[in-house]
Amino acid sequence: MRFTTTIWRPPSLENFKPKFRIYANGVAQVRIYCFGTVSSSRLYNAHNLFDKSPGRDRESYISLLFGFSRDGRTQEAKRLFLNIHRLGMEMDCSIFSSVLKVSATLCDELFGRQLHCQCIKFGFLDDVSVGTSLVDTYMKGSNFKDGRKVFDEMKERNVVTWTTLISGYARNSMNDEVLTLFMRMQNEGTQPNSFTFAAALGVLAEEGVGGRGLQVHTVVVKNGLDKTIPVSNSLINLYLKCGNVRKARILFDKTEVKSVVTWNSMISGYAANGLDLEALGMFYSMRLNYVRLSESSFASVIKLCANLKELRFTEQLHCSVVKYGFLFDQNIRTALMVAYSKCTAMLDALRLFKEIGCVGNVVSWTAMISGFLQNDGKEEAVDLFSEMKRKGVRPNEFTYSVILTALPVISPSEVHAQVVKTNYERSSTVGTALLDAYVKLGKVEEAAKVFSGIDDKDIVAWSAMLAGYAQTGETEAAIKMFGELTKGGIKPNEFTFSSILNVCAATNASMGQGKQFHGFAIKSRLDSSLCVSSALLTMYAKKGNIESAEEVFKRQREKDLVSWNSMISGYAQHGQAMKALDVFKEMKKRKVKMDGVTFIGVFAACTHAGLVEEGEKYFDIMVRDCKIAPTKEHNSCMVDLYSRAGQLEKAMKVIENMPNPAGSTIWRTILAACRVHKKTELGRLAAEKIIAMKPEDSAAYVLLSNMYAESGDWQERAKVRKLMNERNVKKEPGYSWIEVKNKTYSFLAGDRSHPLKDQIYMKLEDLSTRLKDLGYEPDTSYVLQDIDDEHKEAVLAQHSERLAIAFGLIATPKGSPLLIIKNLRVCGDCHLVIKLIAKIEEREIVVRDSNRFHHFSSDGVCSCGDFW
């Protein structure tokens, strides 16, 4: 039979040239040579030919190996290489270069090391292609040490070698190494290619270094590489991440060939810069231009829907995802669940979670737990967390950090025990969440222990711990920690400054230190940040410097609700009721959405100024116009408003109409008003209510005792004092503080412990003489002890605020203002005396008592208008 030299040729195998060699035994052996890029269909046909060939030579094996490698069929390429090795065929550099690329794609470190050994054995490491592929293998396996070692030992390197190493570092955010190598390769005479520039630009984008990015952009244009897709995409990404959206859009419009990555960069960049509508517009343009959407396209736009809470659009995208076959992509699946959760469609999120079989996926479980927490489903979140563990899904660090926000349904100590077993407590993410949970429960010591155990403390962990100290008023610990932070080379962010400024707003904190931190914030260019400026506003208002608070408020480029509320409350506490109401009117004019806190500040302003009708009007606005249901705090404010004005019947009517029984705070307000307005019977009722709820509350006993003393009922007063002794209730002593040269000094009534006590009492005697020259007569009714008037006058003269003022007058330059803080209410006699002292000494004196600020001007007038 005659042997034919023609065989059937598949129509799709255009780039393959089958050649035949006729052996003596008449068997044809096929060689398949691949030219150009082999498509998947052609490679499939080539593979079939290879399998059907009765005999195969080395060239056939190598050709198919190259085809598999180029087509990304890594497992088949690996098996074929092992066959070549097993058959003892001759190896060369091209084979190892090809199979090392396969190893890099597989991230198979063991296989890569075996290939490395073979390269050493055959002496192929001097080949630049093999060395480059080996570097790529190690870098993709995150083995940077060995990857760099291979690179450093290479005798010859080309631009691909440099780019491979640089790209490996860039993928793992090792930015310093990227930029160092980028400069070094040019110094050594290797010109970067488009992929090298893309990697360097990516790093500059991550660091937000727009200036250096512009320099690289100039070099790219000079080299004519700005039109290439990798560089073009990286430039667009750079400008977007640096906030230069306009420049990014210009580059995008000039890009002739736009890949799906180009479109995705614009969508995610717009979203990151808060331009949600522009991002949606870009997505629609992408579809109009018939660009095939990728998984990243869908993930980006679904996240956008989550931010905008667009349920309908989310549902449409869900349908498109199913159509494109992307539903089982983890990023898309998680993005859909998050979007449904943020749109409050928890049933849809839960249905998706169950339908697509997320049972073993920790990311999906975490997304669902987070969704429940965002929708006030703390119990459901904790139940899901428990179910997750029962089904054998191990929580990761993000799961633990999310579930720790489910306080008080879950105990941080319970989660802490689980975290210790996994060693996650040492991670910054979980450690910070854990210490934050302890802080919210007031367990600052536990939080500090967790903080000390975190290995790499980032700025978030430091800020959280500072916030804890701010919450508990541990000023010294917070300031010490801030010093440690800066000494450690960590750069404070806006939240760090916000926390430390909140610490400085505490009663026992130094105003001077607060000003120093303000200066530090200015130096760091963070003083204009919204959270920092709001903290500054609050600090200055609480420390008695309402003018500085007002200045900060005016300079704010943007104001959030916290800023508006802080300014209203600040004015209210300083007795500037009309300014507080003007701020409220400005809010209304700008259509700022108000909350319950806004009206608490407004009611406080009306209360301190005795504006009863105004307070009633704003209460109606809150309920009728703003649709805010009155809370316990709002009712307490209205009771205070009526009580201070002597309208106790209206105050009692508010209490009667409250949905829940009044608490001790409201009854204490009634009791204080009864003392001022001589309503003994109602005062007795209020005291009984308080003592029944809080038997240890000394304020109730003291107010009732004082009320009896003022009415001359010493017998009833004695009974109250006896009851206090029987129950071991101690009266809170009156303290006053003053800050001089960044140091705080405290005084008790009749205090003689200060080193300058002699000078202080001499100053008080001098002031007493000058006060009497002005016609001052002590009001001994404020001394609630059964002693003679002479002794009562001596007691009045030694009240703690007077001692603090006397010390301030001798310890500070003449004419400088004084700020006194007192833990109790200033008595009427001291109020009059301080007005006269301010006039005599020609000084401004600010006193912060338990109710409000009193600004005593040098002309002897108080900001409260003698109504407090």
Curated annotation (Swiss-Prot):
| Residues covered by region (Type E motif) | 666-741
Swiss-Prot/TrEMBL PPR repeat ranges: 57-91, 92-126, 127-157, 158-192, 193-227, 228-258, 259-293, 294-328, 329-359, 361-395, 396-426, 427-457, 458-492, 493-528, 529-559, 560-594, 595-625, 631-661
Q: Which InterPro entries does the UniProt record give?
A: DYW_dom, E_motif, Eplus_motif, Pentatricopeptide_rpt, PPR_At4g14850-like_plant, TPR-like_helical_dom_sf
For the region Type E(+) motif, give the residue spans: 742-772
| Region Type DYW motif, annotated ranges | 773-868
Look up keyword Repeat and say if it applies: yes
Q: Which GO terms describe its biological process?
A: RNA modification
Which molecular function term from Gene Ontology is one that the record holds? zinc ion binding
Where does the UniProt annotation place the signal sequence?
A: none
Q: Which Gene3D superfamilies match?
A: Tetratricopeptide repeat domain
User: PROSITE patterns, per this entry?
Assistant: PPR
Question: What Pfam families does this protein's entry cite?
Answer: DYW_deaminase, E_motif, Eplus_motif, PPR, PPR_2
Q: Which UniProt keywords apply?
A: Repeat
Has the keyword Magnesium been applied to this entry? no
Protein family according to the UniProt entry:
Belongs to the PPR family. PCMP-H subfamily.
The protein here is known as Pentatricopeptide repeat-containing protein At2g27610
User: What organism, scientifically named, is this protein from?
Assistant: Arabidopsis thaliana (Mouse-ear cress)
Its organism's taxonomic lineage begins at: Eukaryota, Viridiplantae, Streptophyta, Embryophyta, Tracheophyta
